[in-house]
Swiss-Prot record:
One of its GO terms (biological process) is pentose-phosphate shunt, non-oxidative branch. It catalyses: aldehydo-D-ribose 5-phosphate = D-ribulose 5-phosphate. It comes from Streptococcus equi subsp. zooepidemicus (strain H70). The keyword Isomerase applies. PANTHER family: RIBOSE-5-PHOSPHATE ISOMERASE 3, CHLOROPLASTIC-RELATED. This is Ribose-5-phosphate isomerase A. It holds the Pfam family Rib_5-P_isom_A. Its EC number is 5.3.1.6. Belongs to the ribose 5-phosphate isomerase family. It is an enzyme of class 5 (isomerase). One of its GO terms (molecular function) is ribose-5-phosphate isomerase activity. The keyword Translocase does not apply.
Amino acid sequence: MEALKKLAGVTAAQYVTDGMTIGLGTGSTAYYFVEEIGRRIKEEGLQVVGVTTSSVTTKQAEGLGIPLTSIDDIDCIDLTVDGADEVDKAFNGIKGGGAALLMEKIVATPTKEYIWVVDESKLVDHLGAFKLPVEVVQYGADRLFRVFERAGYKPSFRMKGDKRLITDMQNFIIDLDLGCIENPFDFGRLLDQTVGVVEHGLFNGMVDKVIVAGQAGVTVLEANQST
């Protein structure tokens, strides 16, 4: 599995060219993309500037000597490469297994070309088997948990050891065990309108390409060619 993830990440790095501002994703597959960018900077003299999606990726990028800038200092990003936990046939996805969904979506929004790198196990017919992360403010989180519980969403707080995980933005994450999300757009809008929800892990209609690594090699799926 690690070999497939590395293959997807290295393939995505081929889309990066000199002068780009690039979004550096978070997670086990995006990790290899960031590593390959670091290698190309060192060995090929690649000239890029990165914008990171988590403190973990920031630390990785700094260790590799990748020049970084703040999302607040730029208007657009040429290319962002990130992982995904599930991708359906309509190119909607669930992200946030690494608890970085808020920063990931902030970086994805001003991106000209948004690429996901996944192994073939992440391709699904319907989203929802992977628990949907919902980032919530700490104030009122238990009340919101009960709201989700009454709605039948089977919520659970994301934990780190015996304490609730706190995200880079100092929020909690409530994971929803939905089983199947029939309409990701409708459910995303419902969460967007829920007071106390900062962001959710539904990335609907955002991705341009999905690079899939499987036993037979790498496949590049183009979202605009989907039916």
